[in-house]
Amino acid sequence: MIRNSGRILFNSLKNSNVKLINRNVIINSNIRLFSTSTNNTIKESVEKKAETISNKDNIASPSSKSIDVSDLAGNADYNFVFERIKTCDKENYINSLLISDPIARRVAYAIRAFNIETVANDHSPKSEKISRLRLSFWKDAINNIYNGKVYDQPLTRVLAQVIKEKKLTKTWFIKILNRREKDNQQVQIKDMEELEQYADDIHSSLMLLTLEGLGVKGNHDVEHCASHLGKAIGIMVLIRGTVYHLASRKTYIPVSLTTKYGINVESLYRGDPQIEKLQNAIYEMASCAKLHLDKAKQFRGKIPHPATEAFLSVSVVEDFLERLRKADFNIFEFPNTQQHPLLLIKLYKNKFFKQF
């Protein structure tokens, strides 16, 4: 079997475990609508608009007006974002909690909350339409923030605040949204190169925004490391969510791999696991993630503090790949929710010694 000949690729990984998210596609919940106006007519108009959007549709909604950039986030807004991450993205909640600087930590939480809001719940035709509306809203919201106007809504106020404080680059936000829009189409990823590009567009962009929050910008080694680690994380997330994706009639296994190993995608959707064929495909995806992880680790010793705090996820990816190897790349038997306290200890140790 092809995966047996290449398992030596994973021998350098140490055993540890990580608490993973039960659902790898993060599910959005409704964001409350806020109105700062005391004018009853405007208030009633806003509430009427809010009622037209059902809870099931689940679209983040601005108020009927924008607020000026000078009137930004308060404690309630930050608490909303904090609880959003704590509830929906425990893994990055912990990683962001380990960032020492409180302002940089707020930036990390805002960025991760933004990522949550851009993820589709599922890939049904109705959800596809809702996702398009949601992404359109967030693209307008980001453009407005950079033009000095802010939708009167908790996360947009927080984003406006951190963008103003840290001068975050607009390009990374738009890059994430453009990839989400493309992903919203019912098209299977073509090959490994496109898979890497998907991971880079989303997860490397998130990492670069986090680094800007830490005050690190324009460092070639840091950005190169972020690109490789972002690709490794992105591929890990897609592998980890394979079972959930299949249940939603979606797969991120590239066409080149399903063709190479004779995987019938429609049969996968209908419940035929095709375990051995799928193991081979998952092995190749994991090998690609391992390759980028190793390239990121080559920058150890070259990354200045506090940038190292953005790269603590190296330990998370290492743990995932090692546990996947032990499961023989069988995602149907993979302990996806298993937690081991040693991983958290390792994360704290790396933070303390300013390494990754």
From Swiss-Prot:
Coiled-coil spans in chain: none
One BP term from GO: mitochondrial respiratory chain complex I assembly
Gene3D superfamilies: Farnesyl Diphosphate Synthase (1.10.600.10)
Disulfide bridges in this chain: none
Transit peptide start and end: 1-41
Localization per record: Mitochondrion inner membrane
Protein purpose: Involved in the assembly of mitochondrial NADH:ubiquinone oxidoreductase complex (complex I) at early stages.
Main subcellular location: mitochondrion
A GO term from the CC aspect: mitochondrial inner membrane
Protein name: NADH dehydrogenase (ubiquinone) complex I, assembly factor 6 homolog
Organism per entry: Dictyostelium discoideum (Social amoeba)
SUPFAM superfamilies given in the database record: Terpenoid synthases
One Pfam family cited in the UniProt record for this chain: SQS_PSY
Similarity section: Belongs to the NDUFAF6 family.
